[in-house]
Protein backbone atom coordinates (compact mmCIF):
# COMPACT_ATOMS: atom_id res chain seq x y z
CA UNK A 1 0.00 0.00 0.00
CA UNK A 2 2.81 2.41 0.75
CA UNK A 3 4.23 1.88 -2.73
CA UNK A 4 0.86 2.91 -4.19
CA UNK A 5 0.92 6.05 -2.04
CA UNK A 6 4.47 6.79 -3.17
CA UNK A 7 3.31 6.35 -6.78
CA UNK A 8 0.49 8.81 -6.26
CA UNK A 9 2.94 11.29 -4.76
CA UNK A 10 5.37 10.79 -7.66
CA UNK A 11 2.60 11.27 -10.22
CA UNK A 12 1.30 14.32 -8.38
CA UNK A 13 4.78 15.85 -8.15
CA UNK A 14 5.52 15.35 -11.85
CA UNK A 15 2.23 16.81 -13.01
CA UNK A 16 2.43 19.68 -10.52
CA UNK A 17 5.94 20.51 -11.69
CA UNK A 18 4.82 20.57 -15.32
CA UNK A 19 1.84 22.79 -14.47
CA UNK A 20 3.99 25.11 -12.37
CA UNK A 21 6.58 25.54 -15.11
CA UNK A 22 3.91 26.20 -17.73
CA UNK A 23 2.12 28.74 -15.53
CA UNK A 24 5.42 30.43 -14.70
CA UNK A 25 6.44 30.61 -18.37
CA UNK A 26 3.10 32.18 -19.26
CA UNK A 27 3.10 34.57 -16.29
CA UNK A 28 -0.07 33.04 -14.89
CA UNK A 29 1.08 31.71 -11.51
CA UNK A 30 -1.35 33.85 -9.51
CA UNK A 31 -4.38 32.96 -11.63
CA UNK A 32 -3.51 29.26 -11.78
CA UNK A 33 -2.91 29.11 -8.02
CA UNK A 34 -6.22 30.88 -7.36
CA UNK A 35 -8.02 28.41 -9.63
CA UNK A 36 -6.35 25.45 -7.93
CA UNK A 37 -7.34 26.78 -4.51
CA UNK A 38 -10.93 27.06 -5.77
CA UNK A 39 -10.78 23.51 -7.10
CA UNK A 40 -9.38 22.31 -3.77
CA UNK A 41 -12.28 23.98 -1.96
CA UNK A 42 -14.73 22.30 -4.35
CA UNK A 43 -13.12 18.93 -3.70
CA UNK A 44 -13.19 19.52 0.05
CA UNK A 45 -16.88 20.40 -0.06
CA UNK A 46 -18.19 17.82 -2.53
CA UNK A 47 -18.04 14.11 -1.83
CA UNK A 48 -19.55 13.49 -5.27
CA UNK A 49 -16.73 15.35 -6.99
CA UNK A 50 -14.14 13.43 -4.96
CA UNK A 51 -15.80 10.17 -6.00
CA UNK A 52 -15.84 11.18 -9.68
CA UNK A 53 -12.11 11.85 -9.77
CA UNK A 54 -11.16 8.87 -7.62
CA UNK A 55 -13.38 6.19 -9.17
CA UNK A 56 -11.66 3.67 -11.42
CA UNK A 57 -15.12 2.71 -12.68
CA UNK A 58 -15.75 6.08 -14.32
CA UNK A 59 -14.09 6.15 -17.73
CA UNK A 60 -11.42 8.60 -18.81
CA UNK A 61 -13.72 10.37 -21.21
CA UNK A 62 -16.43 10.86 -18.59
CA UNK A 63 -13.89 12.14 -16.06
CA UNK A 64 -12.45 14.48 -18.68
CA UNK A 65 -15.90 15.80 -19.57
CA UNK A 66 -16.78 16.31 -15.90
CA UNK A 67 -13.54 18.10 -15.05
CA UNK A 68 -13.49 20.29 -18.14
CA UNK A 69 -17.16 21.23 -17.66
CA UNK A 70 -16.44 22.12 -14.04
CA UNK A 71 -13.41 24.18 -15.07
CA UNK A 72 -15.41 25.99 -17.76
CA UNK A 73 -18.29 26.76 -15.41
CA UNK A 74 -15.90 27.98 -12.70
CA UNK A 75 -14.15 30.24 -15.20
CA UNK A 76 -10.74 28.69 -14.67
CA UNK A 77 -7.74 29.89 -16.64
CA UNK A 78 -7.09 28.13 -19.94
CA UNK A 79 -3.97 26.50 -18.51
CA UNK A 80 -5.98 24.89 -15.69
CA UNK A 81 -8.77 23.79 -18.03
CA UNK A 82 -6.29 22.15 -20.41
CA UNK A 83 -4.33 20.65 -17.54
CA UNK A 84 -7.42 19.00 -16.07
CA UNK A 85 -8.32 17.64 -19.50
CA UNK A 86 -4.88 16.09 -19.93
CA UNK A 87 -4.91 14.68 -16.40
CA UNK A 88 -8.26 12.99 -17.01
CA UNK A 89 -7.24 11.75 -20.46
CA UNK A 90 -4.17 10.11 -18.91
CA UNK A 91 -6.42 8.58 -16.22
CA UNK A 92 -4.64 10.44 -13.42
CA UNK A 93 -7.66 12.25 -11.98
CA UNK A 94 -7.27 10.34 -8.72
CA UNK A 95 -4.07 12.31 -8.09
CA UNK A 96 -5.57 15.80 -8.61
CA UNK A 97 -5.66 16.63 -4.86
CA UNK A 98 -1.99 15.71 -4.58
CA UNK A 99 -1.19 17.73 -7.69
CA UNK A 100 -2.89 20.77 -6.22
CA UNK A 101 -1.00 20.36 -2.96
CA UNK A 102 2.35 19.90 -4.70
CA UNK A 103 1.76 22.93 -6.93
CA UNK A 104 0.80 25.16 -4.00
CA UNK A 105 3.76 23.93 -1.93
CA UNK A 106 6.14 24.71 -4.77
CA UNK A 107 4.64 28.17 -5.20
CA UNK A 108 4.82 28.84 -1.46
CA UNK A 109 8.47 27.77 -1.36
CA UNK A 110 9.26 30.12 -4.24
CA UNK A 111 7.58 32.98 -2.40
CA UNK A 112 9.23 32.17 0.93
CA UNK A 113 5.96 31.13 2.50
CA UNK A 114 5.33 28.30 4.92
CA UNK A 115 2.09 26.34 5.04
CA UNK A 116 0.54 25.54 8.38
CA UNK A 117 -1.80 22.57 8.23
CA UNK A 118 -4.45 23.06 10.87
CA UNK A 119 -6.99 20.40 11.70
CA UNK A 120 -9.71 21.50 14.10
CA UNK A 121 -12.81 19.92 15.57
CA UNK A 122 -15.00 22.64 14.05
CA UNK A 123 -14.48 25.07 11.19
CA UNK A 124 -12.30 28.04 12.09
CA UNK A 125 -13.79 31.50 11.83
CA UNK A 126 -12.07 34.24 9.85
CA UNK A 127 -11.02 35.90 13.11
CA UNK A 128 -9.49 32.65 14.39
CA UNK A 129 -7.63 32.11 11.12
CA UNK A 130 -6.34 35.67 11.24
CA UNK A 131 -5.17 35.31 14.85
CA UNK A 132 -3.48 31.99 14.06
CA UNK A 133 -1.79 33.46 10.99
CA UNK A 134 -0.44 36.37 13.02
CA UNK A 135 0.81 34.11 15.81
CA UNK A 136 2.40 31.65 13.39
CA UNK A 137 4.04 34.43 11.36
CA UNK A 138 5.61 35.70 14.57
CA UNK A 139 6.61 32.23 15.81
CA UNK A 140 8.17 31.06 12.54
CA UNK A 141 9.55 34.33 11.23
CA UNK A 142 8.04 33.47 7.84
CA UNK A 143 4.89 34.30 5.97
CA UNK A 144 2.45 31.56 6.92
CA UNK A 145 -0.44 30.34 4.81
CA UNK A 146 -3.10 28.33 6.60
CA UNK A 147 -4.49 25.11 5.16
CA UNK A 148 -7.42 24.39 7.46
CA UNK A 149 -9.53 21.26 7.61
CA UNK A 150 -12.09 19.84 10.02
CA UNK A 151 -12.00 16.52 11.85
CA UNK A 152 -14.87 16.12 14.34
CA UNK A 153 -13.03 13.15 15.89
CA UNK A 154 -10.75 15.66 17.63
CA UNK A 155 -13.75 16.55 19.85
CA UNK A 156 -12.29 20.01 20.52
CA UNK A 157 -9.11 22.00 20.03
CA UNK A 158 -6.80 21.61 17.07
CA UNK A 159 -3.64 20.10 15.65
CA UNK A 160 -1.19 22.52 14.02
CA UNK A 161 1.61 21.30 11.74
CA UNK A 162 4.24 23.65 10.35
CA UNK A 163 6.97 21.80 8.53
CA UNK A 164 8.18 19.01 10.79
CA UNK A 165 6.81 20.63 13.96
CA UNK A 166 3.43 19.70 15.37
CA UNK A 167 1.39 21.01 18.27
CA UNK A 168 -1.56 18.83 19.27
CA UNK A 169 -3.97 20.59 21.59
CA UNK A 170 -6.96 18.45 20.67
CA UNK A 171 -9.34 17.22 23.32
CA UNK A 172 -9.12 13.65 22.02
CA UNK A 173 -5.34 13.60 22.59
CA UNK A 174 -5.72 15.10 26.06
CA UNK A 175 -8.29 12.42 26.93
CA UNK A 176 -5.97 9.69 25.65
CA UNK A 177 -3.13 11.04 27.78
CA UNK A 178 -5.40 11.17 30.81
CA UNK A 179 -6.52 7.60 30.15
CA UNK A 180 -2.90 6.44 29.95
CA UNK A 181 -2.00 8.32 33.12
CA UNK A 182 -4.91 6.73 34.98
CA UNK A 183 -3.89 3.25 33.82
CA UNK A 184 -0.38 3.87 35.11
CA UNK A 185 -1.70 4.84 38.56
CA UNK A 186 -3.99 1.83 38.97
From Swiss-Prot:
Annotated membrane topology: Peripheral membrane protein
Top-level division of the source organism's lineage: Bacteria
Keywords, alphabetical: ATP synthesis, Cell inner membrane, Cell membrane, CF(1), Hydrogen ion transport, Ion transport, Membrane, Transport
GO molecular function: proton-transporting ATP synthase activity, rotational mechanism
Pfam short name (any one): OSCP
Main subcellular location: membrane
Record-level GO cellular component terms: plasma membrane; proton-transporting ATP synthase complex
Signal sequence annotation: none
Family assignment from sequence similarity: Belongs to the ATPase delta chain family.
Protein name: ATP synthase subunit delta
Amino acid sequence: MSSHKAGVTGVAERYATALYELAEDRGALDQVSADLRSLKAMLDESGDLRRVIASPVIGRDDQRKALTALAEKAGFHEIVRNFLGVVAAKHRSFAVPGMIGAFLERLAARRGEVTARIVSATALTSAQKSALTTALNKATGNTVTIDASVDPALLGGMVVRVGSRMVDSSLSTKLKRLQLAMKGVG
